[in-house]
Amino acid sequence: MKIEASALRQLGIKQIEERAAEIKAELAALRQKKNSGDVGANDIKTAKKNLARALTVRREKILEELVEAYRGTPVSKLPKELRPKLNRSKRRALTKTQLRRKTRRQRARMSKFPRVIFAYNE
């Protein structure tokens, strides 16, 4: 019988883990029965999907708790699984502060030779 994810979301993490253990035991029993031929066509398939659903909901709940625990911390201090997903080049790119920094020589040149804006009038 199919277990709904919404029903699992109402349970706690411990209860979901117990439920997953029950489903694993049921799946093992179904695999043993498979050899004798007493198992329906979709029984093993539904048991595997139920187990996947239970483990998915458990992971969601754990991540929700982690997000609450790390709320307000800077991105650099977050665990990698909670950081925003970026592609490789964006992960390696300089930050905005690093881009804005100038060397002493650059700052001196900028102050000595400011940008000249020419006005054009007819």
UniProtKB/Swiss-Prot annotation:
It is found in: Cytoplasm. The keyword Amino-acid biosynthesis does not apply. Residues 10-69 form a coiled coil. One of its GO terms (biological process) is translation. It comes from the Eukaryota. GO terms for cellular component: cytosolic large ribosomal subunit. Its main location: cytoplasm. GO terms for molecular function: mRNA binding; structural constituent of ribosome. It holds the Pfam family Ribosomal_L29. Keywords: Coiled coil, Cytoplasm, Ribonucleoprotein, Ribosomal protein. Belongs to the universal ribosomal protein uL29 family. Component of the large ribosomal subunit. This is Large ribosomal subunit protein uL29B. It comes from Encephalitozoon cuniculi (strain GB-M1) (Microsporidian parasite).
